A protein has these predicted regions:
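Short beta-strand micro-motifs within the conserved protein kinase catalytic domain, predominantly
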Residues: 44-52, 61-62
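Intrinsically disordered, low-complexity cytosolic regulatory tails
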Residues: 9, 222-233, 239-319
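Conserved catalytic-loop aspartate of Hanks-type protein kinases
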Residues: 168
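Glycine-rich ATP phosphate-binding loop
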Residues: 1-16, 42
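Regulatory alphaC helix of protein kinase catalytic domains
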Residues: 25, 29-30
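Protein kinase catalytic-loop region centered on the HRD/HxD motif
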Residues: 93-106
Length: 319
């Protein structure tokens, strides 16, 4: 849309006919209205009149990371290595701001490529706070119904419905692998052993062939050592044991090279790829909570089982 002064804006219209639509409107308004950060979208205004529920944001010229970097239609944008570093570090700083620099902290709950918008300078902006949760003082987690996007969901959140900062960190780890590899986290058109990016990255890491994950389209500015370091950070963020995942300010320092880390800390990631995994894992969780291994993984053959969506489709579906 265009305002009277000629300013181009992005208009988000939410459903006013469902309780979920109204709830997401209020959640997003509460979460984003009073905070400003270079790597978060800027709320310009809102409308809650009659049946209308509208949020107005600044317009971002280059769409989302899902459309431009990961989209199948291609893009005129050249995502060289330095641009990808800028995007990865920017998103990490935005999440660190939400988690550590405001009170109460905000857990986004839906960090994914389609919610990372790019301005004219390719500065990343985290968007869509409709699923966000405020973390009460002295609380370590919030219990809630599971919502989000399959492929980015932390297993402990999907299984137990406990939202923590580490849930966002897991999602960021998956996103980081996508940024370095230039591919979506799930692609069922590939041979089975290559369909799931997180598993493929772990296998190549164990084989000491991590460089094979890096996007082959990257040009002469590629720093292979730095790209492999980013992939290792992605694996750190997606470890099955929440306690082993670094906090976001530490992730920022790792990405910028200010903090070094030991590869001996990296343990096998966990992944849930369809709803059947949730049912199996939830049953196991109830039966054997105290003996659940930190190295447990769940894998399946599909990535589009409802009620979750594939990684390219925005969703706010609850189970």
């Amino acid at each position: 849309g265009v305002l009277r002064d000629g300013t181009t804006v992005a208009v988000k219209v939410l459903s006013a006919t469902s309780r979920q639509g109204v709830r997401e409107f209020l959640t997003e308004l509460t979460a984003i209205s009073d905070i400003k950060h270079e790597n978060l979208v800027t709320l310009i205004g809102c409308c809650a009149e009659g049946s209308h529920r509208i949020l107005v944001y600044n317009y971002l010229e280059n769409n989302s990371l899902a459309q431009t970097l990961l989209g199948s239609r291609g893009s005129n944008i050249r995502f060289d290595w330095r641009t990808r570093v800028k995007i990865a570090v920017g998103v990490a700083r935005g999440i660190a701001f939400l988690h550590e620099e405001i009170r109460p902290p905000i857990i986004h709950r839906d960090i994914k490529a389609s919610n990372i918008l790019l301005d004219k300078d390719l500065t990343p902006k985290i968007s869509d706070f409709g699923l966000a949760r405020l973390l009460p003082p002295n609380a370590t987690h919030v219990s809630t119904r599971v919502a989000g996007t399959l492929g980015y969901l932390a297993p402990e959140y999907a299984i137990r419905g406990q939202v923590t900062k580490k849930s966002d960190i897991y999602s960021f780890g998956v996103l980081l692998l996508e940024i370095v590899s230039g591919r979506c986290n799930t692609n069922t058109r590939l041979p089975y052993e290559d369909q799931f990016l997180l598993e493929r990255t772990w296998v190549r890491y164990e084989q000491e062939r991590l460089a094979e994950i890096i996007d082959a389209d990257l040009g002469n500015d590629l720093d292979v050592d730095e790209a492999c370091r980013f992939l290792k950070i992605g694996l750190l963020c997606t470890q099955d044991a929440m306690a082993r995942r670094p906090n976001m300010s530490t992730v920022v320092r790792m990405l910028t090279g200010e903090k070094h880390f030991s590869v001996h800390r990296i343990t096998r990631p966990a992944m849930i790829t369809d709803f059947a995994d949730l049912k199996v894992s939830s049953s196991q969780q109830k039966e054997n909570e105290t003996t659940r291994s930190s190295n447990m993984r769940s894998f399946s053959t599909t990535d589009e089982t409802e009620p979750f969506s594939s990684s390219e489709t925005p969703t706010q579906t609850s189970i």
